[in-house]
Amino acid sequence: VTVGTATPLPGERAQTGTAVFVNGHFFLFDVGAGVVQKTENLGLPLTRLNGIFLTHYHSDHMMDLPNIISRSWVMGRTNDLHIYGPDSLTSLVNAANAFLRIENQHRVDHHGPKIMDITKAKAIPHEYHVAQNSSTVMFQEDGITITAFDVSHEPIEPAVGYLIEYKGKKVVISGDTKENALLEKMARDCDILVHEVMLMSFQRMLEKGLDEAGQERNNKIIHDIQDYHTGTTEVAALAERANVKKLVLNHLAPAPDNVVIKNMYLNELKGFSGPIHLANDGDTFIVK
């Protein structure tokens, strides 16, 4: 389920978050702002959440982390909540737990320890290291294997994508990255590739307009972000070479919320011959 499909720019969509349900597990990959509220609005079982996997530590991928730790517990989560991520994850989760300490105690004081089991209030960090241009299996349980792999989001390091495997089925989540050879290798013959995308032609027009308007700061930001994301033609070519069965695009910059932008995307994605989905918040994809 593509819970959140947006970038940091304001809009109706939630920031990045993808839910994966597999063999009794409920995982979330990234938890940007708005993901918690969107998860509940979609009717997803937040109290059953047992794993969060972070791709990197930009705000639009992790800003709802304290919120989801707290909200899932307050609403009735009785299982442990495990957080997985590359280098620096432990300090991040410890900070979130510390931030919530007073709030958690207020809940116990009001509702009692029988209702609010304080032992489940804290999230449990699982930090791992992925070397450059390499991958590591960092989760194996109940027939599920999850592999983290290095992606290209420089100067943001670490940054990873994830390969989820179960009974011969494969789903790959790119995280934020420019075109990446290792990602292409990991995505080979996968059932679904969930990949970020940037409409570079639109960004260049936006950059030109900001320059003409004298918006130096915003112009610099729009210029800079183009060098660590993947363009439409690039992601289409990668998916075609990797023989991806279905391409689901998220972290859409800009959001394809009108027919003009949507058609610009589709016109530039013709290099992929398989099914393409410009994801909306709440879209569901089933791998059989």
Regions found by a protein language model. Give the residues of each.
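Binuclear metal-dependent hydrolase catalytic cores
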Residues: V1-V172, K178, I261-V287
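Cap/insert and terminal regions of metallo-dependent hydrolase folds
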Residues: G161, K167-K170, K178-N280
